[in-house]
Amino acid sequence: MSQDPTGAPSWGAWQSLLVTAVLGLGDGEAVTVEAPQGAARMAKTGGRRMPFLPAKRALTRPWVRLTREEDLLRGQCVGAEVFGGAFPWTAEEHAALLDRGWHPSLADGPDYVRFWPDDVPQGPFLPRADAERAAAAVATTLREVVSPPRPGADDPLPAILRS
C-alpha cells in the first residue's frame, strides 16, 4: 500500500484495496467497510423491554457494506437512528449522505442504499470503472461525512472486512 510523506497509508491505496475486494466478490458475497474507532458513538441497541426505562446504548461505528447481487453492486450505509437505523447521524450528516447519492430505502429497511452501475448493467459483474466509482463513493462518505478531516489529526483508515 502506498503511503503519504508521513508514512501513513494513503486514501488512494486504500481505495485500490477496496476495488480489488469488490471485483473479487462472488454472487451474494459482501465486503463491509467499518469506520475507525474514533468515529464511534453511543447508539441505541435493541428494543425497550419496559416503556419507562431508557433504551440501552452501546458504542457503535458507522459502516458501509457492498454486496454483489448478480451483475449489480448494492451499497448499504448504516441507517439513521431517528429512522430506525443503528447509528445516531446528525441532521447535517444525514443531509451530507443524501448529497453524496445515498438514499433511505423504505422497502429494504432503515439503511441508506446505492447501486452500481446506476443504470442497466452492460455486461457481466461490474466493470472495473464501476468498482472504482463505488470505492470512491465509499471513501468520500467515510472521509467527508463520518470523519471530516481534522487539522493535525492522524486518523487511521477504515477497516475492509470480507463477509
Predicted features along the sequence, with ranges:
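Structured alpha/beta or helical-core interaction and ligand-binding surfaces enriched in interleaved
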Residues: M1-S163
